[in-house]
């Protein structure tokens, strides 16, 4: 269900949004690899506690994209991007967070459902992994994913058609 709070975009936060955000933050803040994080659910940069050590990467994420569709059983997922730290000092800064996409070290998403998939790239192709529940591990199921030269389908969100420019 809904919480009584809104995210930085003014969208009503779902309780599952907040749970996912806290889970990702708690899983990632103590690795020693990150200098900062930024989430759609927070207005400011999420600092890494000093007692965990700080690294040279920044994690940007939307903990539960599509959460407004939870009650109608449409797929939801987590979107993430990783940048290398560019500023001096130990703490991550706004300059570390607001880098262009071409500077990404890695990016990907996880889509949750009856089959949970992780898709990511580090700039050397896009690879898909499917969660094997019996092992509790993601197994490479879709190596070197690419767009077909001649696509069979085209999809657009007609719910936002009023925002399209004439063309």
Question: What would you call each of these model-derived segments?
Answer:
Residues 5, 18-167:
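IMPase-like, lithium-sensitive Mg2+-dependent phosphomonoesterase catalytic core
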